[in-house]
């Protein structure tokens, strides 16, 4: 019996399309566990992507984004925080999912971001816990929406038009167990008994059987013995 871990999969639904991400259950168990718990509680339903920086990150997960006050977006979170979880196997590649936090390394709760391009300057300081496997075109579309910029300095990274996170659903990971199969019997060229190309071994056995039958007939059956002697005398 062999076992192989199948990672959890997150399905992130937005008004600009769907994003599918694989989660790093084994390398970031605390962070992934927190994310899955929130998703299963429908915590992420009907939020907004409140921070958008093209060629950097798109960010969501703040329950304050549900109200009509954009100035408090980015200040909220869930009731519990988790410690910073860093793995050398997880870096800020294009499409990486990471946990947003304050200046306190252990302050991450519910807000998360998706990288728009590689952002290795964040490595070691922010927890990566998954990677987009489908829907990077949606990530790019969100990253390219219009933001307020210099028109509203306090909302410079906030989109002018709302971009919605409808919900997050997770198919949780599991151990896949399969039966181990032993080595199969080798197929020998030339038939069951082998003998190389052309089946020479099988032919020799057939000749031996015919000779044996002939000998038995020779000694056991008088008429056959006489016939054989007659043939031999003619030769």
Question: What positions do the PLM features span?
Answer:
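Cyclophilin-like peptidyl-prolyl cis-trans isomerases
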Residues: 1-235
